[in-house]
C-alpha cells in the first residue's frame, strides 16, 4: 500500500460494500474521507470512527487525496471522478482496493448468486473460534461484529466477492467458495454461458496450492466443475460430494442440526440458530474451508453454534401478541423460495408476506420464476417495484406480476398503508409477518411492530 500520509477518498462511501472497505483502510492507519448523497446510519458510524464525510458530490472533496475509490454506481461524469482524473489522482474500483488488501493476506473469497453474505460471515465466525483472528469484509452487518468489517491481527482475510459487475475477477484469493450459479445480474452478463465463463475464470485464479469449495447441489455449478483446472472440493446433500451433509433431529432451541461425512471422517454434529437448508449448505461451506485450514473440530462446532445471523437475513424484528415479525433481504425467486421454505419449517400457522420487487429489469427477466416463488406463503401483499435508479419498463408492474402469479391470497397493494393495514387485519397469534425485498421495505418491519403493540390492551 502507499504511504499512510496520503488520504484515501471513497465516492459512495455509504454503500454496504464501500463502507466495509473504508473501515478496514481506516483501521490500517490511513486517513479516510468519503462522500455520499445523504447521511445514513452507516455514514454516521464511519464519522464516529474518524472518517471525514462530505454530503453530496463536489470536485473539492477529492483535493489532497492519494487515491479515489469508486463504487460501481459512480460513473465517469461524477464531479469528483472528473476532478481526480484532472489532478492525476488514481481512480480505482472498490474491488481493486479489496484486491490490494487481499494481496497482502491469505485471501478467502466467497462468490455465488445467493448466500454470499451469510457464508462469508459463518467462515469468519469459525476462523475466529479457531483463534485465527481474520480480517473480514462482508456485504451486511454481522451481529457478532456490530459491523460489516473487522480488521484482524492475522494474515487471513475473508471477503465477500461481488460478481454483479465482474469485479470479483480482480481478486486473487488462495481459497474460494462458490455457493451457486443462477440467472442474476443479467444487465451485466449476456447469458448463462457468460456467467459460467466468469465463474470459471474466478475459480481458476487460485494458485496451484489453493483450492475451490463448491456446492454440488446446484445443477448449474455442478455442470461447470469439470472445466475447472484448479482443485475443487464439493459439498452438499448429494452422496457424490466430498463433504456430504446429513441432517439430524435438532436439539431444543436449535433451528438445524447436521453432520458432515467425508472420505476421512464424520464431523459434527453442528448446531445452527438460523433456519433453512440453504443455511445448512452455507455452514457446510464453512466446514469445508475450516478443514482446508486444519482447524480443530471443536472450533468449527463453536463457531457455527455462536453464529446468530446477519442484518436483514431472516432477522427477527419482534414478537407481539404471539405474532412474529421477521425481515429478509430476499429478492430473487430462488432466495424467496428458500426463505419461505425456512419459514414454513419453523412451524408458523400462517406466513403473511409483504414483498417489494427490486428493479424493473429483474422483474421482467425472471417473471416466470417469480410466478412460482410464493407457493409457501399464506398471503402476499405486493408493493410497487423498487426502481433502484432504473426507468420504468412498459407493462412491468407489480399489479401485472400479481396477475401472472394468479395465486389466491396474493394481491397488489396500491400503497404502503394499504399493505400494512391488510396484513395486520389478517395476522393472528402463531402467525409470521415477513417483510421481503432488497429495497426500502425493511423500514416497514418496525412500523408493523409498533402497530401491533398499539393494539395491545393498556
UniProtKB/Swiss-Prot annotation:
Domain of life of the native organism: Bacteria
GO cellular component labels: cytoplasm
Pfam families (alphabetical): Mur_ligase, Mur_ligase_C, Mur_ligase_M
E.C. no: 6.3.2.8
Enzyme class name: ligase
Catalytic activity as recorded in UniProt: UDP-N-acetyl-alpha-D-muramate + L-alanine + ATP = UDP-N-acetyl-alpha-D-muramoyl-L-alanine + ADP + phosphate + H(+)
Keywords: ATP-binding, Cell cycle, Cell division, Cell shape, Cell wall biogenesis/degradation, Cytoplasm, Ligase, Nucleotide-binding, Peptidoglycan synthesis
GO biological process: cell division; cell wall organization; peptidoglycan biosynthetic process; regulation of cell shape
Compartments where found: Cytoplasm
Binding, ATP: 112-118
Record pathway: Cell wall biogenesis; peptidoglycan biosynthesis
Primary location class: cytoplasm
GO molecular function: ATP binding; UDP-N-acetylmuramate-L-alanine ligase activity
Function: Cell wall formation.
Record family assignment: Belongs to the MurCDEF family.
UniProt name for this protein: UDP-N-acetylmuramate--L-alanine ligase
Native source organism of the sequence: Acidobacterium capsulatum (strain ATCC 51196 / DSM 11244 / BCRC 80197 / JCM 7670 / NBRC 15755 / NCIMB 13165 / 161)
Amino acid at each position: 500500500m502507499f504511504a499512510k500520509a496520503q488520504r484515501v477518498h471513497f465516492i459512495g462511501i455509504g454503500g454496504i460494500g464501500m463502507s466495509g472497505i473504508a473501515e478496514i483502510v481506516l483501521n490500517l492507519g490511513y486517513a479516510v474521507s468519503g462522500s455520499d448523497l445523504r447521511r445514513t446510519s452507516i455514514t454516521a458510524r464511519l464519522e464516529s470512527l474518524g472518517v471525514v464525510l462530505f454530503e453530496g458530490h463536489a470536485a473539492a472533496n477529492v483535493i489532497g487525496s492519494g487515491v479515489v475509490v469508486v463504487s460501481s454506481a459512480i460513473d465517469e461524469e461524477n464531479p469528483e471522478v472528473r476532478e481526480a482524473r484532472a489532478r492525476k489522482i488514481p481512480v480505482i474500483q472498490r474491488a481493486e482496493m479489496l484486491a490490494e488488501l487481499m494481496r497482502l493476506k491469505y485471501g478467502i473469497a466467497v462468490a455465488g448468486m445467493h448466500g454470499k453474505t451469510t457464508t462469508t460471515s459463518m467462515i469468519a465466525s469459525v476462523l475466529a473460534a479457531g483463534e485465527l483472528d481474520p480480517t473480514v469484509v462482508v456485504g451486511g452487518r454481522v451481529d457478532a461484529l456490530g459491523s460489516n468489517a473487522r480488521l484482524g491481527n492475522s494474515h487471513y482475510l475473508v471477503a465477500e466477492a461481488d460478481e454483479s459487475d465482474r469485479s470479483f475477477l480482480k481478486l486473487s484469493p488462495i481459497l474460494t467458495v462458490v455457493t451457486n450459479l443462477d440467472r442474476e445480474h443479467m444487465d451485466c452478463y449476456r447469458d448463462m454461458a457468460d456467467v459460467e465463463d466468469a465463474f470459471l475464470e474466478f475459480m481458476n485464479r487460485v494458485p496451484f496450492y489453493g483450492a475451490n469449495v463448491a456446492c454440488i447441489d446446484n445443477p448449474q455449478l455442478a455442470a461447470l466443475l469439470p472445466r475447472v483446472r484448479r482443485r475443487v472440493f464439493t459439498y452438499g446433500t448429494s452422496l457424490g460430494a466430498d463433504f456430504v451433509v446429513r441432517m439430524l433431529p435438532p436439539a431444543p432451541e436449535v433451528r438445524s442440526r447436521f453432520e458432515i461425512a467425508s472420505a476421512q471422517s464424520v464431523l459434527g454434529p453442528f448446531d445452527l440458530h438460523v433456519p433453512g437448508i440453504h443455511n445448512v449448505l452455507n455452514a457446510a461451506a464453512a466446514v469445508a474451508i475450516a478443514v482446508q485450514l486444519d482447524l480443530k473440530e471443536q472450533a468449527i462446532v463453536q463457531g457455527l453454534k455462536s453464529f446468530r445471523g446477519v442484518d436483514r437475513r431472516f432477522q427477527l424484528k419482534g414478537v407481539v401478541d404471539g405474532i412474529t415479525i421477521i425481515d429478509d433481504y430476499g429478492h430473487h425467486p430462488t432466495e424467496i423460495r428458500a426463505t419461505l421454505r425456512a419459514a414454513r419449517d419453523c412451524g408458523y400457522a400462517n406466513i403473511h408476506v409483504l414483498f417489494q420487487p427490486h428493479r424493473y429489469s429483474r422483474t421482467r427477466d425472471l417473471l416466470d420464476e417469480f410466478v412460482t416463488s410464493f407457493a409457501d406463503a399464506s398471503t402476499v401483499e405486493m408493493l410497487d417495484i423498487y426502481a433502484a435508479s432504473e426507468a420504468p419498463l412498459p407493462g412491468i408492474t407489480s399489479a401485472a406480476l400479481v396477475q401472472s402469479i394468479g395465486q389466491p391470497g396474493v394481491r397488489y397493494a396500491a400503497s404502503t398503508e394499504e399493505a400494512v393495514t391488510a396484513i395486520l387485519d389478517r395476522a393472528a397469534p402463531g402467525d409470521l409477518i415477513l417483510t421481503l425485498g432488497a429495497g426500502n421495505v425493511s423500514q416497514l418491519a418496525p412500523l408493523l411492530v409498533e402497530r401491533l403493540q398499539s393494539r395491545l390492551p393498556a
